[in-house]
Amino acid sequence: MQNLLKNLAASLGRKPFVADKQGVYRLTIDKHLVMLAPHGSELVLRTPIDAPMLREGNNVNVTLLRSLMQQALAWAKRYPQTLVLDDCGQLVLEARLRLQELDTHGLQEVINKQLALLEHLIPQLTPFSVASRVGWN
């Protein structure tokens, strides 16, 4: 895994990545946080998503969550990413990759897919974009 991340840093023109105390590598790419962490034989990519529209007070907006989950199912055949709620109830875009089958190019592709999905999801989760879609502007 160290060689994989070393090669990724080089291909991105960055200094070698350094893990935090929990062993998580935190990359900021196009203003998005992408966390990479080894988990057994997998590399887990996680990006927390600020989703103010997902909460209605102390409850979850079930309609929006259902829509997001349907989208995740639709892209599942093309992308390794899925949407999960973490222990705190925060929405996270996550991909689990087998380290044994992963090379630098493959990791870059998955990170690019992660960023593309974020660009698709985030406008759906911000109050301004929801208001403009329903004509409140």
From Swiss-Prot:
Alphabetized UniProt keyword annotations: Cell inner membrane, Cell membrane, Chaperone, Cytoplasm, Membrane, Plasmid
One of the protein's GO biological processes: protein secretion by the type III secretion system
Compartment annotation: Cytoplasm; Cell inner membrane
Cytoplasm as UniProt keyword: yes
Bilayer topology term: Peripheral membrane protein
Entry's Gene Ontology cellular component terms: cytoplasm; plasma membrane
Pfam families in the cross-refs: CesT (PF05932)
Purpose of the protein: Functions as a specific chaperone for YopN. It could facilitate the secretion and the subsequent translocation of YopN.
Subunit structure: Interacts with SycN to form a complex which specifically binds to YopN.
Name by which UniProt lists this protein: Chaperone protein YscB
Gene name as annotated: yscB
